[in-house]
Amino acid sequence: MPARSGGRQAAFPAILDPVRRMAHGCASSAWTIGFYALHNWMLALFDELAQEGAFATHPFLAPAPLAPTGRGVPTGGGVRLTGRWSWATG
C-alpha cells in the first residue's frame, strides 16, 4: 500500500518475503496472505486518483480476478464493466 495511504510502500521482494516464510508453516495461509498482498500491490500501480478512491477506506477489500474475461468501456463518469467472471480470489 502506498505510504501516503498508511502503507509501507515496500518493494515487491519485501512484500513476498513474509509470504514465503509463512508457506513453510502453512501453505494455505501463505496463499491467502500472498493474494491480499498482491491485490494491494497491483492497485498501487494505478494512477493516483484510482488509489485515493481505493485506499480511502479501511479495511479495503480488493478481489482480483486475474483471468481477463470482462471488458471495461469508458463512460461519462467512470467505466462500465461487462462480462462473466467464474471465480475471483481475495
Please place each PLM-identified region on the residue numbering.
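Glycine-rich flavin
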Residues: 1-90
